[in-house]
Amino acid sequence: MKTSKKILCGLFALITAFGFSGCGKKNAGGIKITIWASEGDKPFVQSVVQEFKKKNPDKEYRFVIDIQGTNDVATRVLNDVENAADIFTYSNDQLSKLINGDALTRIAGERLERITAANSKESMEAAYETVNGENHAYGMPYTDNTFFLYYDKSVLTETDVATLDGILSKCSSNKQFAMPMGDGWYTTSFYFGKNLGYNVEYDKNLAETKITCDFDNETGVAVTEAMWSYVKESRFKADANDSKITAGFNDGSIVAAVSGIWNRTAIQEYLGENFAAAKLPTYTLYKGTANEEQVQLTAFAGYKLLGVNNYSKHKTDALDFAEFFTNKENQVKHFEERGVVPTNVEARKDEKVQADICAKAITQQLQYSKTQKGVPSTMWIPMEGLGSAMITGKQSGSFDVRAQLKACVDAIEKNAK
């Protein structure tokens, strides 16, 4: 879900025309389109805006680019959907929530035929939702949204990074492995590896009516015990987040970390020729017993899409821009500038994409993934609480596995009203 990861508060709106207007000047004319995008993507969005204007000289466009993190965009959109951005990026796990709030325009007709032909089958499936018995597309995909392993190949070999135990064997308290254990988007990978999961039932309006989760069965207890055994390690940085991970690679205190493509530029800059990436490692379950086994960490796999607000005053123009933004050329450009792996099937064939370290790691990881769709809205806070309790327990040396896990699952299964 996190994919980038936090809402960046404050409205740093940037009004773009053919050039940037001077202070105090106002241009009330033209077709005003507001775009919400992540801070890291702002320069790329600006460049696409300029190209779009050049290709449409017969229209006077006025674009406003506002900073908004992708993963929690639904909260801001639904706070005031009629005045939200015309165009916004979102992770596909927010699709049902946005549709339920009447926030997304359907993609249809020849436009839908074009984007369906251009993008991977899996990415297009992520754009669809069934409402009142009818299946429709509500967004345009442009990249995969998952996580994998970054590592320093001067410290770790390909053999080392195949297993979490192998990674930790080369780590120390001042050269750690990092994983954001306070974030359920990552920690669910332990449970998914053993085919544990959840089920959500919806009414005709896509409101949740019943949620079940089996993370607290006996297998889930064993998984949680394995997680706790790793978190306790001084070589395991469990309180990691994006800023701590990138800073750790910079100063050498982190030699391997679980993260996503959004941190690629910084990590690669810090590691230089020692930069490497791979799928997630396996972890040891039932360690030291006759049932000991290696379990593959299985990541959430979703997609990021561009959506058009159903209340946009310039819906056709917004759809035209969204289609232009997600076309082959711009997906390749997005990859070149930001390392964002394309969903466009022709863009994926680009030689730069084919040879890319992270693109290869993502392709491998997608073989061990769970589609991020139909995720309980109640999932994230309880999972954050479970991980945070482990992190706190690392300091005190105490963590009640069964009690904490039961509390987590009880909170996840709390039915929506």
Regions found by a protein language model. Name each.
Residues 29-40, 60-66, 87, 138:
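Short, well-ordered beta-strand elements
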Residues 40-60, 191:
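Short, polar/charged alpha-helical segment
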Residues 51, 55-119, 154, 159, ...:
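Extracytoplasmic "Venus flytrap"/periplasmic binding protein-like
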Residues 92-148, 159, 276-279, 288-291:
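Hinge/lid segment of periplasmic solute-binding proteins
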Residues 134-142, 147, 166-212, 254:
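Extracytoplasmic/periplasmic solute-binding protein
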Residues 208-240:
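Glycine-centered hinge/linker elements that transmit conformational signals in sensory
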Residues 269-337:
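Extracytoplasmic/periplasmic substrate-recognition and gating elements
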Residues 345, 363-417:
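Conserved C-terminal helix/tail region of periplasmic/extracytoplasmic solute-binding proteins
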